[in-house]
Amino acid sequence: MLKQQFQASLPLLLALSPLASAMTLYEGADTEFAAKVQGAAGLFHSRESYGQTGVREPGSVNWQEATLQYGIEFKHRSAGLGQVFGALDWVSSASFGDGDAAGWSVGDERTTKIENAYLGWRNDSLEISGGRQNVVVGDGFLISGDALNIGRGLLDGEVNRGGAYYLTGRKAFDQTAILRWGCQQSWRGDLMWLKSDNLAQASPELSVVTLEHVADAGTVGLTAIKVTDTDQALAQILYPERKGMKLYSVRAQGNAGVSDLFLAGEHAWERKPGGADENAWYLEAGWTFSQLPGKPSVNYRYSRFSEGYDPLFYGNGRALGTWFQGEVASNYAGPFNSNTRVHHLGVKAAVSGRVNVGALYYDFATLNRSLGNRDARELDLYAEWTIDEHWSLLPLVGYYKPERSAEDGGSQLGTAKGSVYGQVLLVFGF
């Protein structure tokens, strides 16, 4: 029985930068068609490997990944009748070289599949949509797309999604029906049915309800989720208590009326069908020194995830490290937002109008070491270079130091010495 939860991170610039603007193909008084082309390529190196899938040996690995997304979007406005919108696009993805440091991918995965295929209608206070599309709730603590892209390394390739494990070109839920109501300010909410075709997630179906109050000082939100079905054969191996699970959360994020202040927090309660209760929560505070050159910012966050907590579809939402905590830990070594408490400190500043630099520090402490010891510390240094409106570059260097090797209850193969990790991502959008 595989009890560990695993995920992979979105490249920061694809998730956060505005460079992926579509190219207009036709624009009339009421109708617009646009072409969407965006992608990423990455070079990766890890001095050490991690024993998650049984296909890795101790030592260094080098690999490459690439994704390309391409398709069309449209909007049609009718006076007094709202707007019809939709999209159809594909994603091609590939992994090369050794495959990633944990063996989720082995380096020979290639595939092209439909990514988004949805249709919807909206007016000023209501939106209805359905089809295959990405969904994010809050800042991604619970749901940030269906973005787990396992390759052929796990379960003899049974859950292969086509490679590019880190770049996660595939984020859309396979089937959705979504009703959104409310405005940008005051009360708003969502009613959603989501169906995943991701075998590494055991293909769950989810019913989701959210309620938020949005104001200038911040947003307060409630979320309720029920997992109504799973692929039972895979769920018995990966998530035996996922079907029937209920999850409730309360969250808040804002500046409390102080422009340089950042405050955020969320608490999630999870009830497993067998009666077990799990939980996860975090508190975060940050400050931007807006009067200083480069407007440096500093953030501290404490998060805790109980030993049996199922993190569902978490992912990077508002920033690098939220919620993939540590480039090595979140992608390859664990603890994957379960059975851990984490201290996190992040700093970031602008070197110029096109270049930002930052540092992310993490201290991981395992709650129940009988399930595996993922105690570790990690430091990641990164830069974001916006080359122009279409191209960006993200280099990152990380240092990861576990307390235990895999042979002593950890996950790093062969040694508990510190490991150096490096990556360079090239991201583009037209």
Segments from the language model and where they lie:
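Transmembrane beta-strand segments that form the barrel wall of outer-membrane beta-barrel proteins
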Residues: 161-162, 188-197, 220-228, 261-271, ...
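Extracellular/periplasmic loop regions
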Residues: 235-237, 264-268, 276-358, 408-410
